Amino acid sequence: MYDLTGKHVCYVADCGGIALETSKVLMTKNIAKLAILQSVENPPAIAQLQSIKHSTQIFFWTFDVTMAREEMKKYFDEVMVQMDYIDVLINGATLCDERNIDATINTNLTGMMNTVATVLPYMDRKMGGSGGLIVNVTSVIGLDPSPVFCAYSASKFGVIGFTRSLADPLYYTQNGVAVMAVCCGPTKVFVDRELTAFLAYGQTFADRLRRAPCQSTAVCGQNIVNAIERSENGQIWIADKGGLESVALHWYWHMADQFVNYMQSTDDEDQEFFLGQR
């Protein structure tokens, strides 16, 4: 059980409903500090969060997850001045726009990876950090394909691949930073917008989604926090239709098995090099 009491949480999000609802739940967990980085200012939402727990310090930055990593570094240098350290990083920025593939990939995948690459050195135990937890909020169509939202699905598949790769003991045993993902099912906020299919053949289905039964953002946010509290390194969760379940992961091609002779060190020098101790 991961105890959020006293933790310093950094949430990189868009201005959607899941981020706000997740933050509301986090504020009930006696966290010490909450940094919110999102694309749009929302003072009423910040005030609402603060009213839940007055003793929790909340900081806000207007943030574009698609910015260059060099610019991100400047932001997070400032974040660290206020936060001192980060225990939990939540990546929740998302975009579903099949007409704009670049923006979809940059927001959902490239931006998330750049954020992780920027924040990890602050958390890495071998670089003066205290370890911690990275939570990548993704989608159920990052587990199985979507014939309607092809670009969105591809970006979310990438999040799962990145999460599982970064959670490998090769890194975790060194930096002490666990990595997990929560795959959210559709919410009413998601389907209650103009959705465009990747190809015109799928548009009828995209239009019908508006009438589909979906979970509320409040329930989804609660289950994201539930997943965090039950987290283990490398774990993938599904938060859909009001429920939460762990994904049974399967290896089809495991690098350590396929390249067993390469992956096993032959002497101490190779061991130090492979484990990233140089």
Swiss-Prot record:
InterPro entries: ADH-rel, NAD(P)-bd_dom_sf, Sc_DH/Rdtase_CS, SDR_fam
GO CC term (a single one): cytoplasm
Key word Acetylation present: no
Keyword flag Protein biosynthesis: no
Residues the entry annotates as binding NAD(+): 11-34
GO MF entry, a single one: oxidoreductase activity
Disulphides: none
Keywords linked to the UniProt accession: Oxidoreductase
Active site per database record: Y152 (proton acceptor)
Origin: domain of life: Eukaryota
Binding, substrate: S139
One Pfam family named in its UniProt record: adh_short
PANTHER family per UniProt: 15-HYDROXYPROSTAGLANDIN DEHYDROGENASE [NAD(+)], ALCOHOL DEHYDROGENASE-RELATED
Family: Belongs to the short-chain dehydrogenases/reductases (SDR) family.
Protein name as catalogued: Alcohol dehydrogenase-related 31 kDa protein
Species, as recorded: Drosophila persimilis (Fruit fly)
